[in-house]
Amino acid sequence: MNSLVRRSAQQLSLWRTYCIKHNASEAASPGRNAGRPNYEEFIGRHQRQAQCSIVVQVSSEKSYEELYNYCSSFGSIMGAHHYCVRQDETLHYILLEYATSDEAAAAIGAGVTNGELSGVPVRSPFLWFRAAGGGRRSPKLVANTAPALLSLDGTRQVDQRHLLGLLRGAADIEEQVQQLYEHTRLNELGIRMRFLAALQVQQAIAGMFPAAQAQPFGSSVNGFGRMGCDLDLILRFDSDMGAKIPLEAAVPSRLVYHTKENLSNGRSQTQRHMECFGDMLHLFLPGVCHVRRILQARVPIIKYHHEHLDLEVDLSMSNLTGFYMSELLYMFGEMDPRVRPLTFTIRRWAQTCGLTNPSPGRWISNFSLTCLVMFFLQQLRQPILPTIGALAKAAEPGDSRVTEDGINCTFTRNVDRLGFRSRNQSSLSELLLQFFEFYSQFDFHNRAISLNEGKPLSKPDHSAMYIVNPLEQLLNVSKNVSLEECERLRIEVRNAAWVLESEVENASVPEGDGQELSCGLLNLFKHPEKAVIRPNMFFKPRMVEVSDLFEQKEAGATSSSTPPTPAITYKSASVRQQVQSIKAATRSELKQLRGSGSSVPTSSPNNRRRSR
């Protein structure tokens, strides 16, 4: 009993030391967003956590106590998370975080290769826990009572029925929006797993490229990611991630590395690098499978699936603007606690009514929707968010960021220097209704949306929807949106405004006798067939069958000699024979025309009529 108490006290002391160390490192930069998390600190904290972590495959969550006792011999375990990967069978994994990276490295170094498999032996933070008795002698273990798992099946997404039940039990729309956000956003375990995937890529090339960095960006780190979202990675061989380093800050040296000269075409060089790196991922990295190289895209990427993390990963080497855009969105999300819940609700609404689609195409994307939300929050009488132009004007010399392509991504990283304070006190339900009302009246036909200026601009081209790219201002992030989809968006926001306004006036309305009440957001999240207005009546299908066109032409060719008849069904045998003879004569004349090269066949009946 006394040993258990001493062990618990030791764990508590280590945890207190760990927290003090991490909090001190985050507070080391004075004057940087006091009281508000900084993006660089957020990234750095999770990178350190990844360096202190390992992922071990186990038979079930019941193996945790045995795994804890075994792995405690390498260092102090600060926390453990359990998650499942559901494929043909359910696979169980436990993520262990040590107090230091050296302890995690000791656990990884104690691993052995699987002699039963013929794969290339690779050292990585992904291991599996085999049954006792096999392999080399286990270290001497001290029986300890393992602390409870911090999460059990921690990556399981909430199902639709359970989510609707939570929303139905909420007191009002405000609580519904918060419930939706809390139960669908990317949780802490999901973020940790994504940084582990990045660390695996970085460590794979650390021998040849010690300054290389693989950093997550996009929805995984900007605070707007949902459970199950893909991971976007950028791999850079330099450590500054595009930042300008003053020459006077560099330490002079007379020793210079020999390097390989690149091709004159930078894009071709990047494609060759990525092709080579894709082969390495496919052949050597544990867990990486289904590698696809998409090198001809505007931003060349490598897509792959990580089977131990159940992640879809997009790896690029030249998307620095996407990296800095993630930082900008993270700052917007941290400025006001209403920004992210409002964005999640609007994204969910768009998904429910079919405005967004998982596949790329003519539909509006989640990023474009997020830009619409940010622009709306800039347009309020009492704005909740500042303009990007104001952030750029408040930038200091240390905030300078310029990509290799010369794109200026400079804006202040210290929001407190901006002096922006929002006095807007609107509730989430009020903001949601105002969003729908704002875009139901917005002139998409003539006006463009600019987060940099914070006001509508004249459209520079005839795109159905024009949203100025916040960092590459010559580009339109919604260029893919078709005219039909833009009109659908206007109709759907009008529907939503009408439904939500009715819901505000009537707290809840029964759907029918014997049915549960459907109120608040549930009315917005109804299936499309229950919506008030559908835009399908305004647009005809644009897909046609080519064979039908030829049948119509052939049927129309007989209109001069016979009454109009269907192209396929013939009620008279003589008519069928006449049509067949006309087809045969036409084919013969076409052959003669191709053979002689003349422009008009002389035997054509139409020509004989003209000569008369």
Swiss-Prot record:
Amino acids binding Mg(2+): 230, 232
Boundaries of every PAP-associated domain copy: 427-463
Cofactors: Mg(2+); Mn(2+)
Any one of the GO BP annotations: mitochondrial mRNA 3'-end processing
Pfam families: MTPAP-like_central, PAP_assoc
Its biological purpose: Polymerase that creates the 3' poly(A) tail of mitochondrial transcripts. This is not required for transcript stability or translation but may maintain mRNA integrity by protecting 3' termini from degradation.
Name listed for the protein in its UniProt record: Poly(A) RNA polymerase, mitochondrial
